[in-house]
């Protein structure tokens, strides 16, 4: 059994809460949790606690929610905890050097990609968007740069042809906690090995935007199909037809030469809506029209065949 560490955990969404749950079941002592301040959520815009806060309170772990770490009070508060280590998972706040240096062993971060391939805010989405064959989690020693710290552990898994950001999120939320526990054991035993990142291999995973999710039919069908999976569940790839914005939940690529203008419907039946692109054909299989849930194309055509007639132009 490895030595028990006094750990401060910092995180906010469900992805982080799954890591906290693993720590709470481990031999380590979780002495405090930091999470984002409660935010308005839902139709009523009621102040809502983060998943991490909810879990911490269920286990009677003290919770701190500073807006930032600029005040002396917030820095002194952290120092008074006398932590061995801070574990950071999708916290959402930048940590200044004084915070990184406060725990005896510094701060480590669980990042949702194989570093240095995708640094930044949207590594899961960008790995699918780019057509990567694998992804994973990297646990790194944090420094003042953005995901630039020395790597302590990498765990990988393949990206399947059907994976969306939603499915990869769930897979990494299972992979990450196990890798974290293994890394903590090595840190506690003094056997952890830090490996520097090769900055020449780094890419920045920019945040997604609704504008980016609008389908450009001039792109290759393979790229559009990857975007559809990368932008699921947010912001959802979409196009316009008959002055309606249509979300695309599922599509496939059919390799064949096309002569029609990109965005032109060349076939529409129960097997799919076939759309010309800059290269090959994109076959739409599941769509969501305004005010409705996502449906197979066959059902969409039963209700709105006039929107998707052969020769119609999608924009």
Swiss-Prot record:
Stored InterPro entries: Fmt, Formyl_trans_C, Formyl_trans_C_sf, Formyl_transf_N, Formyl_transf_N_sf, Formyl_transferase-like_C_sf, GART_AS, Met-tRNA-FMT_C
Keywords: Protein biosynthesis, Transferase
Enzyme Commission number(s) of this protein: 2.1.2.9
Catalysed reaction, written as an equation: L-methionyl-tRNA(fMet) + (6R)-10-formyltetrahydrofolate = N-formyl-L-methionyl-tRNA(fMet) + (6S)-5,6,7,8-tetrahydrofolate + H(+)
GO molecular function: methionyl-tRNA formyltransferase activity
GO cellular component: cytosol
Pfam families per the UniProt record, alphabetical: Formyl_trans_C, Formyl_trans_N
Annotated positions binding (6S)-5,6,7,8-tetrahydrofolate: 113-116
PROSITE patterns linked to this entry: GART
Domain of life of the native organism: Bacteria
Function: Attaches a formyl group to the free amino group of methionyl-tRNA(fMet). The formyl group appears to play a dual role in the initiator identity of N-formylmethionyl-tRNA by promoting its recognition by IF2 and preventing the misappropriation of this tRNA by the elongation apparatus.
Similarity-based family: Belongs to the Fmt family.
Protein's recorded name: Methionyl-tRNA formyltransferase
Native source species: Vibrio cholerae serotype O1 (strain M66-2)
């Amino acid at each position: 059994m490895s030595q028990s560490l006094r750990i401060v955990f910092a995180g906010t969404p469900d992805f982080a809460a799954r890591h906290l749950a693993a720590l709470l079941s481990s031999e380590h002592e979780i002495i405090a949790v930091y999470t984002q301040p409660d935010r308005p959520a839902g139709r009523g815009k009621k102040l809502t606690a983060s998943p991490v806060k909810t879990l911490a309170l269920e286990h009677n772990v003290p919770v701190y929610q500073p807006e930032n770490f600029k005040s002396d009070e917030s820095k002194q508060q952290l120092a008074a905890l006398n932590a061995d280590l801070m574990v950071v998972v999708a916290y959402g706040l930048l940590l200044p050097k004084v915070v990184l240096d406060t725990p005896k062993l510094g701060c480590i971060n669980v990042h949702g990609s194989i570093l240095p391939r995708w640094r930044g805010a949207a590594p899961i989405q960008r790995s699918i968007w780019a057509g990567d064959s694998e992804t994973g989690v990297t646990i790194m020693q944090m420094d003042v740069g953005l995901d630039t710290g020395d790597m302590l552990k990498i765990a990988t898994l393949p990206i399947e042809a059907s994976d969306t950001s939603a499915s990869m999120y769930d897979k990494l939320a299972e992979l990450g906690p196990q890798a974290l526990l293994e890394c903590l054991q090595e840190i506690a035993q003094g056997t952890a090995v830090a490996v520097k990142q090769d900055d020449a291999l780094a890419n920045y995973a920019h945040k997604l935007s609704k504008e980016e999710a609008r389908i450009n039919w001039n792109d290759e069908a393979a790229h559009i199909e990857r975007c559809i999976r990368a932008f699921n569940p947010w912001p959802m790839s979409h196009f316009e037809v008959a002055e309606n914005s249509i979300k695309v939940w599922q599509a496939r690529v059919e390799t064949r030469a096309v002569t029609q203008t990109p965005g032109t419907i060349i076939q529409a039946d129960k097997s799919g809506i076939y759309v010309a692109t800059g290269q090959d054909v994109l076959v739409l299989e599941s769509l969501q029209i305004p005010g409705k849930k996502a449906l197979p194309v066959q059902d969409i055509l039963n209700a709105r065949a006039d929107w998707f007639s052969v020769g119609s132009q999608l924009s």
